[in-house]
Amino acid sequence: MNKTLNGLYKKRITELVQTISSLRAKSRIFVMAEVLSFAVSIGFVVLFTVLDDASWTLGVALCVLFLYFYIRNLDTKNDRKIADASALKLVYEKEVAYQTGDYTKFDAGERYLQPTHPFTFDLDVFGQGSLFQRINRTISSGGSDYLAESLSGKWESLPTAELLKHIEQRVEAIGELAGNEPFLSQFKAQGAEKPIDTAAVKEAFGSIHALQIPSYFGNPTFRILIYANLVGFYLSIFLSIGNFVPAFLPLWWGIFNFFLATFCTHKYIKLVNEAISKLKDQVRGYVNMASLIEKQSFTAAHLCELKANLSGAMASFGQLERILQKIDNRSNEIGIVLFNCFGLLDITIVRHFLRWQRTYEPITDQWIGASSVFDALVSMATFRLNEDEAQEATVIDSSGVSYKARSIYHPFLGEKAVRNNFDIQNHEYYIITGANMAGKSTFLRTLGVNYILAMNGLPVFAEEMRVSVFRLFTNMRTTDDLTHGISYFNAELLRLKQLIASLAPNVPSIIILDEILKGTNSLDKLNGSRLFLEYISERNVTGVIATHDLELSKLEDENPQRFHNYSFEIELGTDVTYTYKIGRGVARNQNATFLLKQILI
């Protein structure tokens, strides 16, 4: 646990509770003021109908109505402040839970589980309690997908030189973001209640782009006529107050405006409403996201590039937000009548929509892509901020495999982890023996998970780690599939076949195997394991293999330049003592019979 950071999170929660309480008190005052001002406005309209020569009451009613709209606007802004503060409070509450080891409040990414993936299934990258769940703070499905792709080996598609530059830029970007906790929390708060559905946004944008609006709505002459109409309407109101024109002129003019707006837009307003309303719950998150990024100054090259790719997004999403607000204003019959009478609202909505469509249609995909990458980087930066004991890895350019780690440990174990030193050289094989529960499988996963972190520019759980770029393949968690008639042993063979097919002569690879051929008898397993390792050792492959077969360790005697024995030793006395420390040589003690005797006694 990062005690300093945990204290900061709890302090923020206390402050936000007080802020929310104050804002809710204001909200109650605004509601009462709205009811009162609207009632007064209606009262003056009633007076106009019952008094003689009382056109002045319409002017007062109009002024009070404007006051009502002003108070309503303040109330809306106050409600948004309450929602923002509540979302930020939820962000800090989740981070406090993370600090105490409760990861259930974060998405586990179970939809990304792939048993046939080269390494993610074996290394617990996705699923409950996974690496993804510990890192993921994304507020959009696009950001979540990008993060999942990154942890799944996205780096393997890049040439080494380009990848090294990419890692360097990402380390710089993550470091800068991690140093700005308020920005990270504000960013995460935009999707705290409900994540942005990027696929739905893309689909909605597709519908918007496909919508055909008559060009005359964008004609300058049409716009001038609309403005002239409204100027004349409001002029008639003031003239009627001074008894220069009949009092009923503005009333009939307002009715005319209502029917004019309805006639001009009845074919299109519904289509625009349906298309934009699909974005209603999503676009506000993008507006806030783009606003935060636009206001923030960055020095990291990767962040500056993403910000540049979002250029214009704030204006675009802001215009959509304003269109949505106008649609909200016509969400009931009273709103439709009032806003069309006084402002030709429906015509304004269609005109603004057409202008947005013409201006921003070609580049929305670029904005969504940049937002998704930035979203994933915020998650990575939060991970770096929370894990203050983790260190930056050094990724080197090498034609072969190189993996040197000092005091490396598994990130899931926290303070109770036992740290180990381990070096892996190109085209060499490391046979690890040891008793059950001695730490072999955990150590294999330690190597794999920290490599994934290093390739993504994330801090690793070691005092020092120096690693080259290579392809990773694991075989640790084979499962049968009776639905498709695949037995456990057959599944193992298919996995090994997949491993062999993944190898490329010009691409260095590491294979991490936990018990080759577990689904057969001991002698057959030993012979098969030897056959496989002798075959694979002729390829451009480096391997780390955990096994209970002590006989397999004799490969070092036969080829000491290629095979090396390591072990996790235990101590047997009145009980079993596990050191979880790796050392040279073959394991001497086993514990299966010892533990079974304890059960049977």
Residue ranges and their predicted role:
Residues 1-435, 443-471, 494-495:
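Alpha-helical coupling/stalk and coiled-coil linker elements that connect catalytic or binding modules
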Residues 245, 380-383, 387-601:
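ATPase nucleotide-binding head domains, primarily ABC-like/P-loop NTPase cores
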